[in-house]
A protein has these predicted regions:
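Active-site neighborhood of HAD-like aspartate-dependent phosphohydrolases
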Residues: 1-49
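Active-site flanking residues adjacent to catalytic metal/cofactor-binding acidic residues
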Residues: 7-9, 52, 127-129
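Asp-based, Mg2+/Mn2+-dependent phosphohydrolase catalytic module
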Residues: 65, 69-84, 96-126, 130-161
Length: 161
């Protein structure tokens, strides 16, 4: 069994919207087979955590409550009875703020290590679709996997089974 899987959200779990933000669950579309992949990954990882930049909150396009509702619906769609994702960390800050939580900085990962002190960094992975995801993961000492439309979360899963 692997330790912790950190997942970015937009572009890894769900389809990114071109030039705008996913602000509610009606706009949220799972990338092909990402939901199935998460269900399988849940069986081979000790925990799954999401780390996602959500500056739409900082821009006033959505609220933290909107985001929480979206994430609750995402969780219930993945499994109606249990949370397959153990915790979701998000940074609401604008990029210009240069805060510590916004990737490529490692604040969300540091918070996860505080919440789950037994995380074994060397046995953990971060899967992301952007350079900022990969930089954050590498700077924190995680194994990193970059996905895109041709190499998805589900494709990666097949390489580790």
């Amino acid at each position: 069994m692997y330790d912790t899987l950190f997942l970015d959200r937009d572009g890894v779990i769900n389809v990114k919207l071109e030039g705008r933000y996913v602000t509610n669950f009606s706009e949220f579309v799972f990338i092909k087979d990402s939901d199935t992949a998460i269900r399988k990954l849940h069986k081979i990882f000790k925990r799954i955590l999401v780390v996602t930049n959500q500056q739409g909150i900082g821009k006033g396009i959505m609220t933290e409550n909107d985001l929480n509702i979206l994430h609750q619906k995402m969780q219930r769609t993945l499994d109606p009875e249990i949370n397959l994702i153990d915790k979701i960390y998000f940074c609401p800050c604008l990029e210009e703020k240069k805060c510590n939580c916004r990737k490529p900085k490692t604040g969300m990962l540091e918070n996860a290590k505080i919440d789950f002190p037994d995380i074994n960094i060397q046995q953990s992975f971060l899967v992301g679709d952007s350079n900022s995801d990969i930089i954050a993961g590498k700077n924190f000492g995680l194994n990193t996997i970059k996905v895109d439309e041709n190499f998805t979360l589900n494709n990666w899963l097949k390489t580790i089974l």
